[in-house]
Amino acid sequence: MRGKPLMTRLEIHGHGPGALALHRMLQREGWEGDTGLRERQQVSDGHTTAKALQAAQASLATRSLALSAGSLQLIKACTGSLPAGNDITCVEVQIGAHAASAVGEGLVMRHSDLALEQLGRVVSWSTLVDHLDAKAMPRGRSTAAPLGIAPHDLGERSLQRDQGTTTCSKSAWHIRVWADGDPGEDALEEDADQSAIVGRVYVRGAPQGWALERFLADGPLALLPDQSPQSMQLVWCANARQSESRLRTLREGPAQGGEQSLLRELRMALPKGIALMGIDPGLQCVRLKRRARAQILQICPEDRQVDVWIANAAQSLHPVAGQGLNLGLRDAAELARCLVTIQHIERQGETAQANRMIGLLRRFEEHRQRDRWLLMRITDQLARQSTRFWFQALAPQALKIARQSQLKRFITRTFAFGPREAWPIWA
């Protein structure tokens, strides 16, 4: 069976965690042959050039990402190890500044509640990409775009590699997976008119492995573990005008008292027990919008071509629940299983192969649409409703009820594995 020529050609377009994870998950699931993993290049539908890719990589390199316990299981299953980072062993949810005014007064979820080693891990973008790239390319071949390569050179290299691959007959199907970039001009948007101040702050009093999600009247605030016990990663959301004003205040400099003014405001937003010592000057203001493709699968039987969008190419979420990356990794995991099943059907030489393949892809789309839209609706409503008076007044009472053991366990499991079927995907 191994010698039977394949009738499906695969290409993975992307340079980030989504593309690299899909490549590695395909290998883990038993994919035979080349996955077609390639760097971004200039193509007709407006995807980024090599020069733009290098600029994007530079800006992303130090960005902190929160991986859930489920995502860590997936990464370990397909690479054999975990990327270096800082474990989240405890997550505290607080609503309002009065109902929970100090550390420990909110809903506290611990890794021991689910007998896990951690509820999640905070890693940098570059660390995660390097980890997946190293594991995906055991022979030393890197997917990183070499510095100085012009877009047309990159296109020529890709064309040469295409010509060197196994020749497929005219009846071959071509499957392209778009795993990075923007959901596109036609993406559906949900705009809560919020921006976030993101970056490193210096604190004292934070328990080891502790993460905070605090829903305040002007927007959600999150603290995540960082490189040292004296620092944490801040995500401070508010309406766009207020966030931009806060950043301008910081940029005024010490002479105008800008940093001290922002420190005072942030101290008022943090719970008692967390002493804010300083702010990293590299804080940034990021506009927050949920953008998502309505369709993530396009099949053209006449051309025997399939396009699939996953991860950042399919959706970008508001960070209120910290689940965007985890959703993208679930996209990759389910697509890997689907594609390997399609290849197995080819190897077996089953009849009605095209119909079976289309059916499997449609089933993948159905599963992913259910998962992604459920999570997007949750994050959309949290971002929009959490600043409303009724939420600030009533939700603290609901949070007290959530401290009951069974309900708390459900919430903890949802945080760790997402609002979907049981994990991990791989037994």
Q: Model segments located where?
A:
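Conserved N-terminal helical subregion
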Residues: 3-5, 70-200
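Intrinsically disordered, low-complexity terminal tails and inter-domain linkers enriched
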Residues: 42-58, 100-104, 137-170, 242-257, ...
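FAD/FMN-dependent oxidoreductases across multiple families
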Residues: 242-347, 351-356
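C-terminal helical "tail/cap" subdomain of flavin- and related membrane-associated enzymes
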Residues: 337-427
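Glycine-rich FAD cofactor-binding loop and adjacent beta-loop-alpha segment at the N-terminus
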Residues: 2-89
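Hydrophobic "anchor" residues on beta-strands that sit immediately upstream
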Residues: 10, 35, 174-176, 308
